[in-house]
């Protein structure tokens, strides 16, 4: 999967990188966090709060955007996002 450990991580990364709102949210979370784990946690919590806890936030391909599917993205992109944030 283009260097990703599984389809879900690849799909979430694809959507974050190619959806302006998700990408900007990821940048904001990185800007306000000391490391990738904290940035990912903040990102997922914000997305969950937007759904008011009633629905799971998913990519348009139906992959859930949760911590497990997002952490690899934040670990691989943290420094890059920090530079542009």
What are these regions (language model features)?
Residues 1-85:
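Acidic interaction surfaces
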């Amino acid at each position: 999967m283009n260097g990703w450990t599984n389809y879900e991580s690849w799909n979430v990364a694809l959507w974050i990188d190619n959806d302006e709102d998700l990408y900007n949210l990821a940048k904001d979370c990185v800007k306000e966090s000391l490391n990738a784990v904290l940035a990912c946690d903040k990102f997922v919590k914000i997305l969950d709060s937007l759904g008011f806890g009633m629905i799971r936030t998913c990519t348009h391909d139906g992959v859930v955007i949760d911590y497990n599917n997002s952490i690899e993205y934040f670990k691989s992109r943290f420094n890059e996002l920090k530079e542009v944030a």
